[in-house]
């Protein structure tokens, strides 16, 4: 068994876990302060692992003075940046890390203790290969370039990578990047807007645009995103995983766009933080969410608590995937009155996306729920297109959604097999044939439902 579960720092994740022998023992005395235990059973060539969660060991983490009092906003902000800077590279599992937030935090301190030049080159390779979530890296890279000089070989490498990046799904390329979600969309849009502005006279071959054209393309997309959120609210509302990502993208828009767009992005950011503050109850965020993960079981341990701790240093903190490293170089001001929203009694409801969220909280309890679809029901208009190019990306293979797909359009449910993932008896030729059949079927159903031809 081992206590290793998830390391925030990829440098530590690469170190082999320490395994303790339990063979022949009827009971084991587990260490305090270790909330996760992974047990491994080996029989011949078979290996079975299971992670056990020790709920009583999962407790809030506070950053307070020795006398128990809270640090000031500015003091706490520096502590947050220091925690992020001390992590070499945010772990994305056991194979690689995303270092840009950590590098930004270290630049804030003029900290040269880690090999950030090597990390930058590794990061540029991930962007060039278009890893899923490489838009996160690109967004951070743009922030870096706006604040810190680069010269020589690094400057040339960055330019090559940025010119050849794929900034939206209708551009040339096939990769594992996810474009579809609310946070990813804004990341790509603002990256296109800013990258084009940085190289106005250069040609971006995947976009088939000059930098000046790409800037206008991205700017238009950012405006559409802001229009949508201002009118309908967030679709990933109150998501304690993704609000940190959206925060980072929004402050890039705040910091690196023209004044009118910057002002609108700041207002949307204010709204997002106000919603989270309203649903903060005592030591955690208690809310229905547009996208949710298992961490919701522990409200004090959710990613967005990094944002709430920034606002109110008395609250527990989390690492929040290091996203607040972006804030170290931002001029976005945290709005007044958010701590009051956290602490005051309230009984209210509000709409966001396709949901109406209800909340009642006081000193004794917090109750919250969601109605979806909400009343009144409103939905944006589809683009008036007759034809749309669709790029189906590799990420779906990893999510298994292209092994068994359920299409529920016009009351029809079609369950189909579209790849060989986990089905080794199918030959590649047969799997490809099935995949083509699926695409034709999907195209016909899509055309019937929308009047659009799917190419």
Question: How would you label these PLM feature ranges?
Answer:
Residues 212-279:
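Internal, well-ordered domain-core segments that constitute the primary functional module
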Residues 179-228, 232:
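Active-site cradle of extracellular carbohydrate-active enzymes
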Residues 1-183, 187, 213-222, 314-455:
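Ser/Thr/Asn(+Pro)-rich, low-complexity disordered segments
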Residues 251, 259, 263-330:
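Extended amphipathic alpha-helical segments with heptad-repeat/coiled-coil character used for oligomerization
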Residues 143-147, 193-198, 248-256:
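Short glycine/serine- and small hydrophobic-enriched flexible loop segments
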Residues 132-145, 168-180, 223-240, 271-298:
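Charged/polar, low-hydrophobicity segments characteristic of intrinsically disordered regions
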Residues 138, 185, 189, 240-247:
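Short alpha-helical patches at coil-to-helix transitions and adjacent helical residues
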């Amino acid at each position: 068994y081992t206590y290793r579960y998830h390391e925030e720092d990829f440098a530590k994740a690469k170190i082999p876990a320490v395994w303790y022998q339990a063979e022949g023992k009827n009971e084991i005395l587990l260490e305090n302060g270790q909330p996760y235990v992974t047990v491994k059973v080996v029989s011949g060539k078979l290996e079975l692992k299971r992670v056990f969660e020790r709920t009583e060991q999962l407790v809030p983490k506070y950053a307070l003075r020795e006398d128990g009092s809270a640090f000031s906003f500015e003091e706490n902000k520096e502590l947050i940046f220091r925690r992020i800077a001390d992590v070499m590279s945010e772990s994305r599992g056991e194979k690689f890390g995303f270092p840009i937030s950590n590098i930004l935090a270290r630049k804030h301190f003029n900290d040269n203790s880690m090999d950030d030049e090597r990390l930058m080159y590794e990061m540029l390779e991930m962007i060039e290969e278009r890893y899923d979530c490489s838009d996160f890296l690109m967004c951070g890279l743009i922030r870096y370039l706006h604040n810190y000089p680069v010269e020589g070989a690094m400057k040339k490498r960055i330019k090559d990578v940025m010119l050849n990046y794929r900034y939206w799904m209708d551009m040339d390329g096939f990769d594992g990047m996810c474009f579809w979600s609310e946070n990813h969309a804004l990341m790509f849009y603002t990256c296109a807007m800013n990258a084009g502005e940085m190289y106005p006279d250069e040609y971006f071959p995947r976009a088939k645009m000059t930098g000046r054209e790409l800037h206008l393309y991205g700017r238009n997309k950012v405006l559409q995103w802001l229009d949508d959120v201002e009118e309908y609210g967030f679709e990933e509302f109150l998501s304690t995983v993704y609000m940190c990502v959206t925060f980072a993208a929004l402050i890039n828009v705040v910091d690196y766009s023209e004044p009118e767009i910057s002002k609108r992005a700041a207002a949307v950011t204010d709204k997002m933080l106000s919603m989270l503050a309203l649903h903060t109850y005592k030591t955690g965020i208690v809310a229905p969410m547009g996208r949710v993960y298992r961490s919701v079981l522990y409200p004090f341990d959710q990613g967005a608590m990094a944002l709430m701790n920034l606002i109110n240093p008395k609250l527990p903190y989390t690492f929040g995937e290091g996203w607040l490293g972006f804030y170290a170089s931002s001029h976005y001001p945290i709005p007044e009155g958010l701590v009051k929203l956290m602490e005051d009694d309230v009984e209210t409801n509000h709409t966001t996306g396709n949901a109406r969220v209800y909340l009642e909280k006081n000193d004794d309890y917090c109750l919250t729920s969601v109605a979806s679809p909400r009343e009144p029901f409103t939905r944006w208009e589809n683009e008036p297109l007759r034809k749309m190019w669709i790029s189906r990306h590799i990420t779906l293979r990893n999510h298994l959604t292209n092994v068994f797909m359920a299409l529920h359009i016009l009351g029809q449910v079609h369950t189909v097999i579209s790849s060989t993932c986990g089905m080794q008896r199918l030959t590649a030729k047969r799997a490809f044939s099935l995949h083509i059949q699926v695409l034709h079927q999907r195209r016909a159903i899509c055309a019937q439902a929308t009047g659009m031809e799917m190419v």
